[in-house]
Protein backbone atom coordinates (compact mmCIF):
# COMPACT_ATOMS: atom_id res chain seq x y z
CA UNK A 1 0.00 0.00 0.00
CA UNK A 2 2.85 2.38 0.91
CA UNK A 3 4.60 1.48 -2.34
CA UNK A 4 1.40 2.31 -4.27
CA UNK A 5 1.06 5.70 -2.56
CA UNK A 6 4.72 6.49 -3.28
CA UNK A 7 4.28 5.61 -6.94
CA UNK A 8 1.10 7.72 -7.11
CA UNK A 9 2.93 10.70 -5.59
CA UNK A 10 5.77 10.34 -8.08
CA UNK A 11 3.36 10.21 -11.03
CA UNK A 12 1.44 13.23 -9.71
CA UNK A 13 4.68 15.20 -9.24
CA UNK A 14 5.81 14.37 -12.77
CA UNK A 15 2.41 15.42 -14.14
CA UNK A 16 2.56 18.76 -12.29
CA UNK A 17 6.11 19.31 -13.57
CA UNK A 18 4.94 18.59 -17.13
CA UNK A 19 2.05 21.07 -16.85
CA UNK A 20 4.35 23.73 -15.39
CA UNK A 21 6.91 23.22 -18.19
CA UNK A 22 4.18 23.43 -20.82
CA UNK A 23 2.86 26.70 -19.37
CA UNK A 24 6.32 28.23 -19.24
CA UNK A 25 6.94 27.19 -22.84
CA UNK A 26 3.73 28.84 -24.01
CA UNK A 27 4.54 31.98 -22.06
CA UNK A 28 7.94 32.28 -23.69
CA UNK A 29 6.60 31.61 -27.20
CA UNK A 30 7.11 34.58 -29.54
CA UNK A 31 6.48 34.32 -33.29
CA UNK A 32 9.49 35.58 -35.23
CA UNK A 33 7.80 36.14 -38.53
CA UNK A 34 4.35 37.36 -37.59
CA UNK A 35 3.75 40.55 -39.55
CA UNK A 36 1.10 43.15 -38.96
CA UNK A 37 -2.25 42.34 -40.26
CA UNK A 38 -1.23 38.65 -40.00
CA UNK A 39 -3.37 36.96 -37.36
CA UNK A 40 -0.96 34.10 -36.67
CA UNK A 41 0.59 34.25 -33.25
CA UNK A 42 -1.03 37.45 -32.07
CA UNK A 43 -3.34 35.73 -29.61
CA UNK A 44 -0.31 34.18 -27.89
CA UNK A 45 1.08 37.54 -26.89
CA UNK A 46 0.20 38.88 -23.44
CA UNK A 47 0.36 42.40 -24.85
CA UNK A 48 -2.86 42.02 -26.84
CA UNK A 49 -6.37 42.12 -25.45
CA UNK A 50 -9.71 43.74 -26.10
CA UNK A 51 -9.85 47.51 -25.65
CA UNK A 52 -13.10 49.43 -25.52
CA UNK A 53 -13.49 53.16 -25.92
CA UNK A 54 -16.36 55.02 -24.31
CA UNK A 55 -17.88 57.42 -26.78
CA UNK A 56 -21.47 57.56 -25.63
CA UNK A 57 -24.47 55.79 -27.09
CA UNK A 58 -23.04 55.45 -30.60
CA UNK A 59 -20.21 53.13 -29.60
CA UNK A 60 -20.35 49.43 -30.52
CA UNK A 61 -18.32 47.59 -27.89
CA UNK A 62 -17.89 44.58 -30.13
CA UNK A 63 -15.63 46.57 -32.46
CA UNK A 64 -12.64 47.19 -30.25
CA UNK A 65 -8.93 46.53 -30.36
CA UNK A 66 -6.85 43.66 -29.11
CA UNK A 67 -5.12 44.54 -25.88
CA UNK A 68 -3.18 43.01 -22.99
CA UNK A 69 -5.00 40.41 -20.93
CA UNK A 70 -2.72 41.36 -18.08
CA UNK A 71 -4.46 44.70 -17.69
CA UNK A 72 -7.12 43.20 -15.44
CA UNK A 73 -5.39 44.90 -12.53
CA UNK A 74 -7.66 45.56 -9.59
CA UNK A 75 -8.39 48.95 -8.13
CA UNK A 76 -6.49 51.08 -10.65
CA UNK A 77 -7.22 54.64 -9.61
CA UNK A 78 -8.04 57.41 -12.06
CA UNK A 79 -4.98 59.39 -13.09
CA UNK A 80 -4.91 63.12 -12.43
CA UNK A 81 -4.66 65.58 -15.31
CA UNK A 82 -0.87 65.65 -15.02
CA UNK A 83 0.96 63.13 -12.87
CA UNK A 84 4.50 63.43 -11.65
CA UNK A 85 6.82 60.52 -12.51
CA UNK A 86 8.13 58.56 -9.59
CA UNK A 87 11.53 59.61 -8.35
CA UNK A 88 12.66 56.03 -8.66
CA UNK A 89 12.39 56.44 -12.43
CA UNK A 90 14.78 59.38 -12.50
CA UNK A 91 18.29 58.55 -13.65
CA UNK A 92 21.65 60.03 -12.82
CA UNK A 93 22.47 61.75 -16.09
CA UNK A 94 26.18 61.68 -15.31
CA UNK A 95 26.08 57.89 -15.47
CA UNK A 96 24.42 57.76 -18.88
CA UNK A 97 26.27 57.16 -22.15
CA UNK A 98 26.90 60.14 -24.43
CA UNK A 99 24.10 61.63 -26.50
CA UNK A 100 23.84 60.47 -30.09
CA UNK A 101 23.15 63.48 -32.32
CA UNK A 102 22.60 61.15 -35.26
CA UNK A 103 19.52 59.71 -33.58
CA UNK A 104 16.44 61.94 -33.96
CA UNK A 105 12.95 61.56 -32.51
CA UNK A 106 9.70 63.17 -33.70
CA UNK A 107 8.14 65.26 -30.94
CA UNK A 108 4.64 66.75 -30.66
CA UNK A 109 3.72 69.79 -28.55
CA UNK A 110 0.02 69.92 -29.44
CA UNK A 111 -1.51 68.53 -26.21
CA UNK A 112 -3.51 70.65 -23.78
CA UNK A 113 -5.62 70.41 -20.65
CA UNK A 114 -7.86 72.75 -18.63
CA UNK A 115 -5.17 73.46 -16.06
CA UNK A 116 -2.85 75.14 -18.59
CA UNK A 117 -4.98 75.71 -21.69
CA UNK A 118 -8.51 76.17 -20.39
CA UNK A 119 -9.65 73.04 -22.22
CA UNK A 120 -8.46 69.68 -23.47
CA UNK A 121 -6.55 69.75 -26.73
CA UNK A 122 -5.88 66.62 -28.79
CA UNK A 123 -6.63 64.25 -25.89
CA UNK A 124 -10.29 64.75 -26.87
CA UNK A 125 -9.54 63.90 -30.50
CA UNK A 126 -12.63 63.06 -32.58
CA UNK A 127 -13.15 59.64 -34.06
CA UNK A 128 -12.42 60.06 -37.76
CA UNK A 129 -14.96 58.78 -40.24
CA UNK A 130 -14.06 56.34 -42.98
CA UNK A 131 -14.35 57.89 -46.45
CA UNK A 132 -16.78 55.16 -47.55
CA UNK A 133 -20.20 55.85 -45.93
CA UNK A 134 -21.04 52.15 -46.07
CA UNK A 135 -18.06 51.39 -43.85
CA UNK A 136 -18.32 54.54 -41.73
CA UNK A 137 -21.81 53.64 -40.49
CA UNK A 138 -20.40 50.57 -38.72
CA UNK A 139 -18.12 52.56 -36.42
CA UNK A 140 -18.56 55.00 -33.54
CA UNK A 141 -18.78 58.74 -33.88
CA UNK A 142 -18.02 61.53 -31.46
CA UNK A 143 -15.12 62.78 -29.39
CA UNK A 144 -13.11 61.28 -26.59
CA UNK A 145 -13.80 62.58 -23.10
CA UNK A 146 -10.60 63.15 -21.06
CA UNK A 147 -9.07 62.64 -18.63
CA UNK A 148 -10.15 58.98 -18.39
CA UNK A 149 -11.12 58.57 -22.05
CA UNK A 150 -8.41 59.89 -24.37
CA UNK A 151 -7.66 59.56 -28.07
CA UNK A 152 -5.04 56.87 -27.61
CA UNK A 153 -4.81 53.13 -27.05
CA UNK A 154 -2.15 53.73 -24.37
CA UNK A 155 -2.20 56.03 -21.33
CA UNK A 156 0.71 58.37 -20.50
CA UNK A 157 2.49 58.17 -17.17
CA UNK A 158 2.02 61.95 -17.00
CA UNK A 159 -1.72 61.69 -17.57
CA UNK A 160 -3.57 63.91 -20.03
CA UNK A 161 -0.87 66.54 -19.84
CA UNK A 162 -0.43 69.97 -21.37
CA UNK A 163 2.49 70.64 -23.69
CA UNK A 164 2.60 74.09 -22.06
CA UNK A 165 3.42 72.68 -18.65
CA UNK A 166 7.14 73.43 -18.05
CA UNK A 167 7.44 70.39 -15.77
CA UNK A 168 6.09 68.16 -18.55
CA UNK A 169 8.57 69.57 -21.07
CA UNK A 170 11.37 69.03 -18.56
CA UNK A 171 10.29 65.45 -17.93
CA UNK A 172 10.21 64.80 -21.67
CA UNK A 173 13.74 66.14 -22.07
CA UNK A 174 14.92 63.95 -19.20
CA UNK A 175 13.36 60.92 -20.84
CA UNK A 176 15.00 61.70 -24.17
CA UNK A 177 18.33 62.26 -22.44
CA UNK A 178 17.98 58.96 -20.60
CA UNK A 179 17.45 57.28 -23.99
CA UNK A 180 20.63 58.86 -25.45
CA UNK A 181 18.60 60.64 -28.13
CA UNK A 182 20.50 63.72 -29.25
CA UNK A 183 17.93 65.58 -31.35
CA UNK A 184 14.17 66.09 -31.20
CA UNK A 185 12.37 66.95 -34.43
CA UNK A 186 9.64 69.33 -33.30
CA UNK A 187 6.33 69.27 -35.14
CA UNK A 188 5.94 72.86 -36.32
CA UNK A 189 3.28 75.12 -37.79
CA UNK A 190 3.84 78.81 -38.57
CA UNK A 191 2.77 81.39 -35.96
CA UNK A 192 -1.00 81.57 -35.49
CA UNK A 193 -1.47 78.37 -37.52
CA UNK A 194 -2.42 74.96 -36.17
CA UNK A 195 -3.68 71.55 -37.17
CA UNK A 196 -7.44 71.05 -37.35
CA UNK A 197 -7.62 69.56 -33.85
CA UNK A 198 -5.15 71.84 -32.10
CA UNK A 199 -4.06 75.36 -31.26
CA UNK A 200 -0.99 77.36 -32.39
CA UNK A 201 2.19 76.11 -30.73
CA UNK A 202 5.01 78.25 -32.12
CA UNK A 203 5.04 80.25 -28.89
CA UNK A 204 6.16 77.09 -27.07
CA UNK A 205 9.39 76.84 -29.05
CA UNK A 206 11.49 79.11 -26.78
CA UNK A 207 10.65 77.01 -23.71
CA UNK A 208 11.32 73.77 -25.57
CA UNK A 209 14.69 75.10 -26.74
CA UNK A 210 15.62 76.19 -23.21
CA UNK A 211 14.62 72.88 -21.64
CA UNK A 212 16.40 70.94 -24.38
CA UNK A 213 19.58 72.93 -23.82
CA UNK A 214 19.48 72.11 -20.11
CA UNK A 215 19.96 68.45 -21.06
CA UNK A 216 22.32 69.15 -23.99
CA UNK A 217 19.69 68.14 -26.52
CA UNK A 218 19.26 69.79 -29.92
CA UNK A 219 16.04 70.81 -31.65
CA UNK A 220 15.31 70.60 -35.36
CA UNK A 221 12.01 71.37 -37.07
CA UNK A 222 9.47 69.00 -38.62
CA UNK A 223 7.45 71.30 -40.87
CA UNK A 224 3.84 70.20 -41.09
CA UNK A 225 1.65 70.56 -44.24
CA UNK A 226 -0.01 73.82 -43.25
CA UNK A 227 -2.66 75.25 -45.58
CA UNK A 228 -1.38 76.39 -48.99
CA UNK A 229 2.24 75.52 -48.23
CA UNK A 230 4.38 76.41 -51.25
CA UNK A 231 7.85 77.60 -52.23
CA UNK A 232 7.09 81.23 -51.44
CA UNK A 233 5.76 80.88 -47.90
CA UNK A 234 8.26 78.11 -47.15
CA UNK A 235 11.07 80.59 -47.78
CA UNK A 236 9.35 83.03 -45.45
CA UNK A 237 8.88 80.41 -42.73
CA UNK A 238 12.41 79.03 -42.93
CA UNK A 239 13.69 82.59 -42.65
CA UNK A 240 11.44 83.12 -39.63
CA UNK A 241 12.75 79.98 -37.89
CA UNK A 242 16.40 80.79 -38.50
CA UNK A 243 16.07 84.48 -37.62
CA UNK A 244 14.13 83.79 -34.41
CA UNK A 245 15.68 80.56 -33.16
CA UNK A 246 18.90 80.06 -35.10
CA UNK A 247 21.16 81.62 -32.46
CA UNK A 248 19.86 79.47 -29.62
CA UNK A 249 22.49 76.97 -28.40
CA UNK A 250 19.95 74.13 -28.74
CA UNK A 251 19.23 74.90 -32.42
CA UNK A 252 20.39 71.89 -34.43
CA UNK A 253 22.82 72.04 -37.29
CA UNK A 254 24.21 69.10 -39.22
CA UNK A 255 27.79 69.14 -40.38
CA UNK A 256 27.96 68.09 -44.03
CA UNK A 257 30.78 66.33 -45.84
CA UNK A 258 32.10 69.72 -46.90
CA UNK A 259 32.30 70.84 -43.28
CA UNK A 260 29.37 73.26 -43.43
CA UNK A 261 27.00 73.20 -40.46
CA UNK A 262 23.47 73.69 -41.79
CA UNK A 263 20.02 73.66 -40.19
CA UNK A 264 17.90 70.63 -41.01
CA UNK A 265 14.20 70.69 -41.84
CA UNK A 266 12.03 67.60 -42.15
CA UNK A 267 9.16 68.37 -44.54
CA UNK A 268 6.12 66.24 -43.81
CA UNK A 269 3.90 65.29 -46.78
CA UNK A 270 6.34 67.02 -49.12
CA UNK A 271 4.83 65.12 -52.07
CA UNK A 272 1.69 67.29 -51.87
CA UNK A 273 3.59 70.15 -53.51
CA UNK A 274 4.67 69.70 -57.13
CA UNK A 275 8.40 69.18 -57.76
CA UNK A 276 8.50 72.31 -59.93
CA UNK A 277 7.42 74.41 -56.96
CA UNK A 278 10.02 72.89 -54.67
CA UNK A 279 12.69 73.38 -57.33
CA UNK A 280 12.02 77.13 -57.24
CA UNK A 281 13.16 77.08 -53.63
CA UNK A 282 15.63 74.21 -53.38
CA UNK A 283 17.74 74.37 -56.55
CA UNK A 284 20.49 76.90 -57.16
CA UNK A 285 18.79 78.05 -60.36
CA UNK A 286 15.33 78.33 -58.78
CA UNK A 287 13.39 81.59 -59.01
CA UNK A 288 13.20 81.80 -55.18
CA UNK A 289 16.35 79.83 -54.43
CA UNK A 290 17.33 79.55 -50.80
CA UNK A 291 20.65 77.96 -51.72
CA UNK A 292 23.90 79.67 -50.76
CA UNK A 293 21.93 82.22 -48.75
CA UNK A 294 21.94 82.79 -44.97
CA UNK A 295 18.80 80.63 -44.89
CA UNK A 296 20.17 77.61 -46.71
CA UNK A 297 19.69 74.29 -44.99
CA UNK A 298 19.23 70.57 -45.40
CA UNK A 299 15.67 69.82 -46.50
CA UNK A 300 14.50 66.25 -45.97
CA UNK A 301 11.52 65.01 -48.00
CA UNK A 302 9.04 62.34 -46.96
CA UNK A 303 9.21 59.35 -49.29
CA UNK A 304 5.99 57.34 -49.35
CA UNK A 305 5.81 55.72 -52.80
CA UNK A 306 8.72 54.46 -54.88
CA UNK A 307 7.93 56.99 -57.62
CA UNK A 308 8.61 59.80 -55.16
CA UNK A 309 12.35 59.12 -55.49
CA UNK A 310 12.64 60.98 -58.76
CA UNK A 311 10.23 63.73 -57.71
CA UNK A 312 12.51 64.33 -54.73
CA UNK A 313 15.53 64.55 -57.02
CA UNK A 314 13.78 67.00 -59.32
CA UNK A 315 12.65 69.07 -56.34
CA UNK A 316 16.17 69.64 -55.05
CA UNK A 317 15.76 68.05 -51.62
CA UNK A 318 18.87 67.03 -49.69
CA UNK A 319 17.58 63.73 -48.35
CA UNK A 320 14.64 61.48 -47.58
CA UNK A 321 12.97 60.08 -44.49
CA UNK A 322 10.27 57.43 -44.26
CA UNK A 323 8.36 58.50 -41.10
CA UNK A 324 5.70 55.80 -40.82
CA UNK A 325 6.17 53.22 -38.08
CA UNK A 326 4.11 50.65 -39.97
CA UNK A 327 6.35 48.15 -41.72
CA UNK A 328 4.63 47.26 -45.00
CA UNK A 329 2.22 50.20 -45.00
CA UNK A 330 4.10 52.17 -47.66
CA UNK A 331 7.04 51.53 -49.95
CA UNK A 332 9.19 53.85 -47.86
CA UNK A 333 8.20 52.40 -44.49
CA UNK A 334 8.85 48.79 -45.58
CA UNK A 335 12.10 47.54 -44.11
CA UNK A 336 12.77 45.34 -47.12
CA UNK A 337 13.12 48.43 -49.34
CA UNK A 338 15.60 50.33 -47.20
CA UNK A 339 18.70 48.80 -48.73
CA UNK A 340 17.71 49.87 -52.25
CA UNK A 341 16.66 53.32 -50.99
CA UNK A 342 20.05 53.71 -49.37
CA UNK A 343 21.76 52.79 -52.65
CA UNK A 344 19.62 55.34 -54.46
CA UNK A 345 20.53 58.03 -51.95
CA UNK A 346 24.22 57.21 -52.16
CA UNK A 347 24.09 57.39 -55.95
CA UNK A 348 22.55 60.86 -55.92
CA UNK A 349 24.30 62.22 -52.83
CA UNK A 350 21.17 62.31 -50.68
CA UNK A 351 20.91 61.75 -46.93
CA UNK A 352 18.96 58.58 -46.13
CA UNK A 353 17.08 58.67 -42.82
CA UNK A 354 15.04 55.52 -42.13
CA UNK A 355 12.29 55.99 -39.55
CA UNK A 356 11.75 53.32 -36.91
CA UNK A 357 8.83 52.95 -34.51
CA UNK A 358 7.95 50.71 -31.56
CA UNK A 359 4.57 49.75 -33.02
CA UNK A 360 1.41 51.27 -34.41
CA UNK A 361 -2.23 51.39 -33.34
CA UNK A 362 -4.53 54.28 -34.23
CA UNK A 363 -7.90 52.60 -33.75
CA UNK A 364 -8.85 54.98 -30.93
CA UNK A 365 -9.26 57.65 -33.62
CA UNK A 366 -9.54 55.44 -36.75
CA UNK A 367 -11.45 52.38 -35.52
CA UNK A 368 -11.72 51.04 -39.08
CA UNK A 369 -7.92 50.91 -39.54
CA UNK A 370 -7.12 47.66 -37.74
CA UNK A 371 -5.22 46.28 -40.73
CA UNK A 372 -2.40 48.73 -40.07
CA UNK A 373 -2.00 47.89 -36.39
CA UNK A 374 1.52 46.72 -35.58
CA UNK A 375 1.89 44.78 -32.35
CA UNK A 376 4.86 45.83 -30.22
CA UNK A 377 5.65 42.22 -29.22
CA UNK A 378 7.12 43.48 -25.94
CA UNK A 379 9.76 45.54 -27.75
CA UNK A 380 10.71 43.01 -30.40
CA UNK A 381 9.08 44.94 -33.25
CA UNK A 382 11.09 48.03 -32.29
CA UNK A 383 14.36 46.14 -32.17
CA UNK A 384 13.72 44.47 -35.52
CA UNK A 385 13.18 47.91 -37.07
CA UNK A 386 16.29 49.38 -35.45
CA UNK A 387 18.34 46.42 -36.64
CA UNK A 388 17.01 46.85 -40.19
CA UNK A 389 17.90 50.54 -40.10
CA UNK A 390 21.44 49.89 -38.85
CA UNK A 391 22.03 47.36 -41.61
CA UNK A 392 21.76 50.15 -44.20
CA UNK A 393 24.58 52.09 -42.47
CA UNK A 394 22.58 55.34 -42.50
CA UNK A 395 23.88 58.83 -41.83
CA UNK A 396 20.95 59.40 -39.44
CA UNK A 397 18.08 57.42 -37.92
CA UNK A 398 14.74 58.91 -36.92
CA UNK A 399 12.31 57.49 -34.37
CA UNK A 400 8.55 57.72 -34.86
CA UNK A 401 7.81 58.91 -32.27
CA UNK A 402 8.39 60.27 -28.79
CA UNK A 403 4.75 61.14 -28.13
CA UNK A 404 2.35 60.67 -31.04
CA UNK A 405 -0.16 59.01 -28.74
CA UNK A 406 -3.03 58.97 -31.25
CA UNK A 407 -1.14 56.54 -33.48
CA UNK A 408 0.39 54.50 -30.68
CA UNK A 409 3.96 55.11 -31.85
CA UNK A 410 5.20 56.72 -28.62
CA UNK A 411 8.29 55.67 -26.69
CA UNK A 412 7.29 58.01 -23.85
CA UNK A 413 6.43 56.24 -20.60
CA UNK A 414 2.97 54.69 -20.46
CA UNK A 415 1.18 53.12 -17.49
CA UNK A 416 -1.60 50.58 -16.94
CA UNK A 417 -5.03 52.16 -16.65
CA UNK A 418 -8.60 50.99 -16.74
CA UNK A 419 -11.93 52.68 -16.19
CA UNK A 420 -15.48 51.35 -16.27
CA UNK A 421 -15.48 51.57 -20.08
CA UNK A 422 -11.84 51.58 -21.14
CA UNK A 423 -8.85 49.34 -20.63
CA UNK A 424 -5.63 50.74 -22.07
CA UNK A 425 -2.65 48.98 -23.53
CA UNK A 426 0.59 49.21 -21.59
CA UNK A 427 4.17 47.95 -21.68
CA UNK A 428 3.83 45.10 -19.16
CA UNK A 429 5.38 42.75 -18.22
CA UNK A 430 8.05 45.43 -18.58
CA UNK A 431 8.28 48.79 -16.85
CA UNK A 432 6.96 52.10 -18.27
CA UNK A 433 10.46 53.03 -19.40
CA UNK A 434 10.97 49.95 -21.60
CA UNK A 435 11.21 51.82 -24.91
CA UNK A 436 13.53 54.46 -23.50
CA UNK A 437 15.83 51.68 -22.30
CA UNK A 438 15.73 49.92 -25.66
CA UNK A 439 16.43 53.20 -27.42
CA UNK A 440 19.45 53.81 -25.21
CA UNK A 441 20.78 50.32 -25.96
CA UNK A 442 20.44 50.78 -29.72
CA UNK A 443 21.71 54.36 -29.60
CA UNK A 444 24.98 53.08 -28.15
CA UNK A 445 25.16 50.33 -30.75
CA UNK A 446 24.44 52.75 -33.59
CA UNK A 447 26.99 55.25 -32.32
CA UNK A 448 29.73 52.61 -32.24
CA UNK A 449 28.87 51.17 -35.66
CA UNK A 450 28.50 54.58 -37.28
CA UNK A 451 31.92 55.65 -36.08
CA UNK A 452 33.49 52.80 -38.06
CA UNK A 453 31.74 53.29 -41.39
CA UNK A 454 31.70 57.08 -41.08
CA UNK A 455 35.48 57.02 -41.18
CA UNK A 456 35.41 54.70 -44.20
CA UNK A 457 33.08 57.04 -46.11
CA UNK A 458 34.52 60.28 -44.72
CA UNK A 459 31.23 61.29 -43.10
CA UNK A 460 31.31 63.81 -40.27
CA UNK A 461 31.62 62.03 -36.92
CA UNK A 462 30.66 64.90 -34.63
From Swiss-Prot:
InterPro entries: Glyco_Hydrolase_99 (IPR026071), Glycoside_hydrolase_SF (IPR017853). Belongs to the glycosyl hydrolase 99 family. Undergoes proteolytic cleavage in the C-terminal region. Coiled coil: none annotated. It catalyses: N-{alpha-Glc-(1->3)-alpha-Man-(1->2)-alpha-Man-(1->2)-alpha-Man-(1->3)-[alpha-Man-(1->2)-alpha-Man-(1->3)-[alpha-Man-(1->2)-alpha-Man-(1->6)]-alpha-Man-(1->6)]-beta-Man-(1->4)-beta-GlcNAc-(1->4)-beta-GlcNAc}-L-asparaginyl-[protein] + H2O = alpha-D-glucosyl-(1->3)-D-mannopyranose + N(4)-{alpha-D-Man-(1->2)-alpha-D-Man-(1->3)-[alpha-D-Man-(1->2)-alpha-D-Man-(1->3)-[alpha-D-Man-(1->2)-alpha-D-Man-(1->6)]-alpha-D-Man-(1->6)]-beta-D-Man-(1->4)-beta-D-GlaNAc-(1->4)-beta-D-GlcNAc}-L-asparaginyl-[protein] (N-glucan mannose isomer 8A1,2,3B1,2). It is found in: Golgi apparatus membrane. Pfam families: Glyco_hydro_99 (PF16317). This is Glycoprotein endo-alpha-1,2-mannosidase.
